UniProtKB/Swiss-Prot annotation:
Record's keyword annotation contains Cytoplasm: no
Annotated positions of the Isoleucine amide modification: 138
Proregion span(s): 19-43, 74-118
Major localization listed first in the record, in broad terms: secreted
Tissues and organs where the protein is expressed, per its UniProt entry: Expressed by the skin glands.
UniProt keyword Magnesium present: no
InterPro entries noted in UniProt: Bombinin
Family under the similarity heading: Belongs to the bombinin family.
Record keywords: Amidation, Amphibian defense peptide, Antibiotic, Antimicrobial, Cleavage on pair of basic residues, Cytolysis, Fungicide, Hemolysis, Secreted, Signal
Asparagine amide modification, residue list: 70
Annotated protein name in UniProt: Maximins 4/H3 type 7
Record's function text: Maximin-4 shows antibacterial activity against both Gram-positive and Gram-negative bacteria. It also shows antimicrobial activity against the fungus C.albicans, but not against A.flavus nor P.uticale. It has little hemolytic activity. It does not possess a significant cytotoxicity against tumor cell lines. It does not possess a significant anti-HIV activity.
GO cellular component: extracellular region
């Protein structure tokens, strides 16, 4: 009789533990889905902003190149042009549509997001400095 009682209690504990593990797995998978959706939305917004910034920078670079193509440049102008060229190279290196679709299909990785933040931070700083210098010069 004691043996039956021990087996019954053990069975109840095991089934409660199994239900607990199953509930934990379900809540984790739901959390992963929500996190992936929010990251996808953030990435979409970032892509739109990056495309707009890239188009604006390309236009600015063309205008500056035309302005300084035939004229003499000061050291400051030369530095601004070097910064803009570096920014354009950085933006072009981010523009790989094949890799972007692969990343979307396999999910988002925190390392990739951190890498993009590390790239975009200095790029935006350089753009701000370059535009500030140009506005000072024009004004």
């Amino acid at each position: 009789m004691n043996f039956k009682y021990i087996v019954a209690v053990s069975f109840l504990i095991a089934s409660a533990y199994a239900r607990s593990v199953q509930n934990d797995e379900q809540s984790l998978s739901q959390r992963d889905v929500l996190e992936e959706e929010s990251l996808r939305e953030i990435r979409g917004i970032g892509g739109v902003l990056l495309s707009a910034g890239k188009a604006a920078l390309k236009g600015l670079a063309k205008v500056l190149a035309e302005k300084y193509a035939n004229g003499k440049r000061t050291a400051e102008d030369h530095e601004v042009m070097k910064r803009l060229e570096a920014i354009m190279r950085d933006l072009d290196s981010l523009d790989y549509p094949e890799e972007a679709s692969e990343r979307e299909t396999r999910g988002f990785n925190q390392d990739e997001i951190a890498k993009e933040k590390r790239i975009l931070g200095p790029v935006l700083g350089l753009v701000g400095n370059a535009l500030g210098g140009l506005i000072k010069k024009i004004g």
